[in-house]
Amino acid sequence: MKAFHLLAALAGAAVAQQAQLCDQYATYTGGVYTINNNLWGKDAGSGSQCTTVNSASSAGTSWSTKWNWSGGENSVKSYANSGLTFNKKLVSQISQIPTTARWSYDNTGIRADVAYDLFTAADINHVTWSGDYELMIWLARYGGVQPIGSQIATATVDGQTWELWYGANGSQKTYSFVAPTPITSFQGDVNDFFKYLTQNHGFPASSQYLITLQFGTEPFTGGPATLSVSNWSASVQ
């Protein structure tokens, strides 16, 4: 009987460490990280998506998201992600943004990307789901999907060659660094991307606050497919 109670307690503890997020904007917070199902574009097509949290603490996050979307071939349906809570500061005052991302997709016959998404704004109190500038780092893309705008350069950052794309979404200026082949294990300094933009494309680092830092996947169509993130962590220093 004691063994049964011990097993039951362990099972309960395991369940308590996880969360299943299926509502449109369901979130789970652990430590300095928040995981968001974030089905912001679901009305552009039809389908479903749920995100499972394996762990979230000050040490990092582990989670997965399973989706199946159809319709609206060129429209993003969601951005399930893990985001970092940090003290906002001017980009010019940031010394480094170390990060690690290890992930895998169980189905690559899809239209989707796997990407970092960061927003900056001149107003430190700007809403966190948009900005004056957006920086995306695409670690992978499948099915021929493309960032907003067009390619303007080939850049070398953090020892990796990237396609650099630029486009505008209303007044928001978006720079996207796109890996030519999937990077399923990434460890680097996101601040190096800001430094590149400041030095080569006039990014106003001294007047823009970093307000959002996230990592996740943008599905367009396809599935069922599951993105599994075995580890993601980041800090703003």
UniProtKB/Swiss-Prot annotation:
Induction note: By cellulosic materials and hemicelluloses.
A single GO cellular-component term on record: extracellular region
Keywords tagged on the record: Carbohydrate metabolism, Cellulose degradation, Glycosidase, Hydrolase, Polysaccharide degradation, Pyrrolidone carboxylic acid, Secreted, Signal
Signal is among the record's keywords: yes
Record PTM Pyrrolidone carboxylic acid, positions in chain: Q17
Miscellaneous comment as given in the Swiss-Prot or TrEMBL entry: Will also hydrolyze 1,4-linkages in beta-D-glucans also containing 1,3-linkages.
The family this protein is said to belong to: Belongs to the glycosyl hydrolase 12 (cellulase H) family.
Protein name: Endoglucanase-1
Species this chain originates from: Aspergillus aculeatus
